[in-house]
Amino acid sequence: MKFWKYHGIGNDFIVLDCITDPVPVDPAWCEQVCDRHFGIGADGVLYILPGQGTDITMRIINADSSEAEMCGNGIRCVAKHAVDTGLVDKDEFTIMTGRGVLKAKVRKDPDDEYTSFVQIDMGAPILDARSVPVDFDGRFIDQPFEADGVKFHANAVSMGNPHFLSLIHI
């Protein structure tokens, strides 16, 4: 099995081209290879699969074997890999994700053959707390929150995977 290791703004992934070399999506295997002590080590495995009415499909299996709908850092790695390896032969294309169809735009470095810029239209953020999911009615925006005796305000948002955000003034 051939794989690639990609890094995207602090996340690292094992990338599998399942178009050229089909392998089954196997969450238990992903958990093993993502282990940083006994495996390759990664935040997750990115499967690049044939498109479903799109140019390609991406599935993400996290290091704990759960499946994510989307990951911004992961989809940029997938888009770069797809163009750099010839799976996709255009600068703008579509990727099916667990969150739906997302549009990718890439730009190659004029001095070499590799992609130097990747832009993904992530769509609108999900702000409804129950859809994030958070046990709260409505939008969880600038809500008071306490953890370990520290009080702060936080926001719950999803772009296909849940985020809990707090702005901190330093």
Which residues fall in each region the model found?
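ATP-dependent small-molecule kinase catalytic core of the GHMP/sugar-kinase superfamily
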Residues: T97-L167
